[in-house]
């Protein structure tokens, strides 16, 4: 019996070029790779190799000057020469929410509670029902071990707790692809373990993820595939997640 073809084919970058104004050469030049649906791709590389820039262009926070970014064979961004000085891509808000991103710096709103931080975007941007969004937010907080902190303020949380809230804030938008940029870089070993446990659970649940990290142990624990970004993308290995 033939298996039915899935409608979720993955995420793909083809011949991506990113260059900043007045730069002698692109920071990303002819970059191509694919992340299969439900898998985890980890990007390693030295400082200044363009890892964070790669994630920012994929998230639509910066325009690309060449190539394409696609989800499930649908192009969501295409390179436009002459956009080196532009602040963001011209991707629509609907397309933006198909990709979620969590930064190293958390970026939580200090004047909103944990619950308020998580529910703001789906209510204001996606126009979803507030009560339903709040119920989902509470469920997400339970998944990351923070069900009792929904009314807390960001300054009352540890770094690991704030990072878990940031992950919930991205997940509640139902992204098809989740980008994680050095999310353990500023955390102590105990907090790294807290965040790694959450990411491992996401991987087991089938969340497609693209992760930038400098920690090889973290990479090997979570990755289906690892690539190195330096002057080019080099396939390293296909570790067994454990």
Specify the residue positions occupied by each region the protein language model found.
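A short, proline-enriched helix->beta-strand linker immediately N-terminal to the Walker B motif
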Residues: 172-176
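Catalytic Walker B motif of ABC-type/P-loop ATPase nucleotide-binding domains
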Residues: 178-181
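H-loop/switch region of ABC-family ATPase nucleotide-binding domains
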Residues: 213-214
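Helix-to-loop junction immediately C-terminal to a conserved catalytic motif
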Residues: 59
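The feature captures the beta-strand-to-loop junction immediately N-terminal to the Walker
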Residues: 44-46
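Conserved ABC ATPase signature
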Residues: 153-157, 161
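ABC ATPase NBD coupling module
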Residues: 76-100, 130
